[in-house]
Design a protein with these regions (language model features):
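Short, surface-exposed beta-strand/strand-loop-strand elements in extracellular ectodomains
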Residues: 194-206
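Catalytic domains of carbohydrate-active enzymes that cleave complex glycans
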Residues: 1-125
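Disordered, acidic Ser/Thr/Pro-rich linker "stalks" and the adjacent N-terminal cap
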Residues: 112-180, 188-197
Length: 207
C-alpha cells in the first residue's frame, strides 16, 4: 500500500487499488500464498476452514476487479463467484462492507450485471462527444466508461462518470445508422458520497 502511493479510504473499493497493492502481479502472489496455505493444512478441517475464511477478502477483490476489465475470463469469474457464494454461506458471512450488503444479494446482482447476457449494446465502442464534460476526477475513464459495456459498481469510484452542480450533456456517435428498440442508462445513488440520481433524463436521436 505504501509503495503504491494510493491512499486507503474508509469506504474504499478494491478497484481503486487494482494498479497498486492489488495489481495483477501481486494478486497472483497472494493467490499462490493461499494455495500453499490451504495445501499445508489440507488434513486439518479446522485450520483449512480458517484459511478459506481468510481468503474470502482476496476472492472478493478478484471478483470486483474482474468486472472492470474488458475481455476478462468470464468463465473463470463465474466459477470464482460460485465458490465465493458457497464459502460465504458456509462460514455465515453476514455482510461484505460498511453498507451491510449481504453476500447472497451481491452474488445475484453480480450475475445479472457483470456476467455475459444475451443482448449486446449497439453503443459499444461509440465515440463520445462532450457538450458538458464530466468533473476532472472522472475524465481519465470518461471517454470509454459510457460505451465499454461494463456496469459501474456500488461506489462512485467504480467505473462511473459524474457531474457536480450541472447537467450532463453529451453525444454518442454510433458511426452509422442503426435500428434499436430502446435506450437504457444506468445511474448511481450513493448518499454518503453526495451522489444523487438525476431529476429527469431526456434523449434525442438523429438520422
Amino acid at each position: 500500500l505504501l509503495a503504491s502511493g494510493q491512499p486507503l479510504w474508509i469506504y474504499d473499493s478494491p478497484i481503486s487499488h487494482k494498479k497498486g497493492m492489488l495489481n495483477p502481479h501481486l494478486m497472483k502472489v497472494y493467490d499462490e500464498l493461499f494455495d500453499k496455505a490451504e495445501k499445508a493444512v489440507a488434513n486439518d478441517k479446522v485450520l483449512l476452514e480458517r484459511v478459506q475464511l481468510s481468503r474470502l477478502p482476496l476472492q472478493y477483490s478478484q471478483l470486483e476487479i474482474a468486472r472492470t476489465e474488458a475481455g476478462s475470463d468470464k468463465q473463470k469469474s463465474r466459477e470464482l463467484l460460485e465458490l465465493f457464494e458457497q464459502r460465504t454461506a458456509q462460514f455465515g458471512v453476514k455482510s461484505l462492507n460498511e453498507r451491510n450488503n449481504p453476500p447472497a444479494e451481491y452474488c445475484v446482482l453480480y450475475r445479472k450485471r457483470f456476467l455475459p447476457q444475451n443482448e449486446k449494446s449497439l453503443a459499444a465502442g461509440a465515440k463520445v462527444e462532450w457538450i458538458s464534460k464530466p468533473e476532472a476526477k472522472y475524465q481519465t475513464i470518461a471517454d470509454e466508461a459510457l460505451t465499454d459495456e461494463l456496469y459501474g459498481g456500488t461506489t462512485y469510484v467504480e467505473s462511473w462518470v459524474g457531474w457536480e452542480g450541472r447537467d450532463a450533456e453529451f453525444i454518442l456517435d454510433l458511426g452509422e445508422e442503426k435500428s434499436f428498440s430502446r435506450i437504457e442508462t444506468d445511474f448511481l445513488h450513493q448518499l454518503g458520497a453526495w451522489v444523487l440520481l438525476p431529476k429527469s433524463v431526456t434523449y434525442f436521436v438523429s438520422s
